């Protein structure tokens, strides 16, 4: 079966907030959701978590909103720095919803685990997976591909699990990125070749594949990158990264195909570098 080839061009480098609500408790035992609602911040409606500070009248504000305020948003009294140890003890026995509950996450967990979960939560908004910091778009997973198709039209997409990624003008000076898309098995993959300037003008290339999908979905696939030519071969095989985690950490840790300019020249022709890309299901 012949490989498709795509050419990747370098991309270059107020109203007063409502009062805190007091839940109506039915029966003698408060439900977990009733207790959690006691900790709602009256400004942002996120949760007030330990260490908990109150105003002189006992009203609470979360740690994110507190530095932005000059008085209590509920009673307009001075904020003060009074520690509410009783509410902190209650917080230790409450399971709080994930901050992305409105997006579909159904997890409830202790406040000590909340921040770590939310950092990895699959319902957290996705950022644009294109390398570089120029695009600040964020949205749901379902909206990623429409965003790429409408806002990044220069990115080529090839169909099939076995294709050739052709990066042009690899001798361009400075930091450069090459990007293309590969569609197979009902999913979309983003292939990235990144050139970085290191010390003393030394340059390194980093090639990696990421799935337009969740971490769990990414575990179902493997990818192989291969430089092949002039009776030489250089191969890298790994699990694709999810765009949820991105590729910055993998590149920083060299957890991808890494080679320098001297290696690149062994496989390049007329300043262009072809990388064979194969996606397979595990």
UniProtKB/Swiss-Prot annotation:
<keyword id="KW-0862">Zinc</keyword>
<dbReference type="GO" id="GO:0006511">
    <property type="term" value="P:ubiquitin-dependent protein catabolic process"/>
</dbReference>
<keyword id="KW-0808">Transferase</keyword>
<comment type="function">
    <text>E3 ubiquitin-protein ligase that mediates ubiquitination and subsequent proteasomal degradation of target proteins. E3 ubiquitin ligases accept ubiquitin from an E2 ubiquitin-conjugating enzyme in the form of a thioester and then directly transfers the ubiquitin to targeted substrates. It probably triggers the ubiquitin-mediated degradation of different substrates.</text>
</comment>
<feature type="binding site">
    <location>
        <position position="117"/>
    </location>
    <ligand>
        <name>Zn(2+) 1</name>
    </ligand>
</feature>
<dbReference type="GO" id="GO:0061630">
    <property type="term" value="F:ubiquitin protein ligase activity"/>
</dbReference>
<feature type="zinc finger region" description="RING-type">
    <location>
        <begin position="41"/>
        <end position="76"/>
    </location>
</feature>
<feature type="region of interest" description="Disordered">
    <location>
        <begin position="1"/>
        <end position="28"/>
    </location>
</feature>
<dbReference type="InterPro" id="IPR001841">
    <property type="entry name" value="Znf_RING"/>
</dbReference>
<dbReference type="InterPro" id="IPR004162">
    <property type="entry name" value="SINA-like_animal"/>
</dbReference>
<dbReference type="InterPro" id="IPR013083">
    <property type="entry name" value="Znf_RING/FYVE/PHD"/>
</dbReference>
<dbReference type="Pfam" id="PF03145">
    <property type="entry name" value="Sina_TRAF"/>
</dbReference>
<keyword id="KW-0833">Ubl conjugation pathway</keyword>
<feature type="binding site">
    <location>
        <position position="105"/>
    </location>
    <ligand>
        <name>Zn(2+) 1</name>
    </ligand>
</feature>
<dbReference type="InterPro" id="IPR008974">
    <property type="entry name" value="TRAF-like"/>
</dbReference>
<comment type="subunit">
    <text>Homodimer.</text>
</comment>
<dbReference type="GO" id="GO:0008270">
    <property type="term" value="F:zinc ion binding"/>
</dbReference>
<dbReference type="InterPro" id="IPR049548">
    <property type="entry name" value="Sina-like_RING"/>
</dbReference>
<dbReference type="InterPro" id="IPR018121">
    <property type="entry name" value="7-in-absentia-prot_TRAF-dom"/>
</dbReference>
<keyword id="KW-0479">Metal-binding</keyword>
<comment type="similarity">
    <text>Belongs to the SINA (Seven in absentia) family.</text>
</comment>
<dbReference type="GO" id="GO:0005634">
    <property type="term" value="C:nucleus"/>
</dbReference>
<comment type="pathway">
    <text>Protein modification; protein ubiquitination.</text>
</comment>
<dbReference type="Pfam" id="PF21362">
    <property type="entry name" value="Sina_RING"/>
</dbReference>
<keyword id="KW-0863">Zinc-finger</keyword>
<feature type="binding site">
    <location>
        <position position="135"/>
    </location>
    <ligand>
        <name>Zn(2+) 2</name>
    </ligand>
</feature>
<feature type="zinc finger region" description="SIAH-type">
    <location>
        <begin position="93"/>
        <end position="153"/>
    </location>
</feature>
<dbReference type="GO" id="GO:0051402">
    <property type="term" value="P:neuron apoptotic process"/>
</dbReference>
<dbReference type="Pfam" id="PF21361">
    <property type="entry name" value="Sina_ZnF"/>
</dbReference>
<feature type="binding site">
    <location>
        <position position="147"/>
    </location>
    <ligand>
        <name>Zn(2+) 2</name>
    </ligand>
</feature>
<protein>
    <recommendedName>
        <fullName>E3 ubiquitin-protein ligase Siah1</fullName>
        <ecNumber>2.3.2.27</ecNumber>
    </recommendedName>
</protein>
<dbReference type="InterPro" id="IPR013010">
    <property type="entry name" value="Znf_SIAH"/>
</dbReference>
<dbReference type="GO" id="GO:0031624">
    <property type="term" value="F:ubiquitin conjugating enzyme binding"/>
</dbReference>
<feature type="binding site">
    <location>
        <position position="152"/>
    </location>
    <ligand>
        <name>Zn(2+) 2</name>
    </ligand>
</feature>
<feature type="binding site">
    <location>
        <position position="98"/>
    </location>
    <ligand>
        <name>Zn(2+) 1</name>
    </ligand>
</feature>
<dbReference type="GO" id="GO:0016567">
    <property type="term" value="P:protein ubiquitination"/>
</dbReference>
<feature type="binding site">
    <location>
        <position position="121"/>
    </location>
    <ligand>
        <name>Zn(2+) 1</name>
    </ligand>
</feature>
<dbReference type="GO" id="GO:0005737">
    <property type="term" value="C:cytoplasm"/>
</dbReference>
<feature type="region of interest" description="SBD">
    <location>
        <begin position="90"/>
        <end position="282"/>
    </location>
</feature>
<feature type="binding site">
    <location>
        <position position="128"/>
    </location>
    <ligand>
        <name>Zn(2+) 2</name>
    </ligand>
</feature>
<dbReference type="GO" id="GO:0043161">
    <property type="term" value="P:proteasome-mediated ubiquitin-dependent protein catabolic process"/>
</dbReference>
<dbReference type="GO" id="GO:0005829">
    <property type="term" value="C:cytosol"/>
</dbReference>
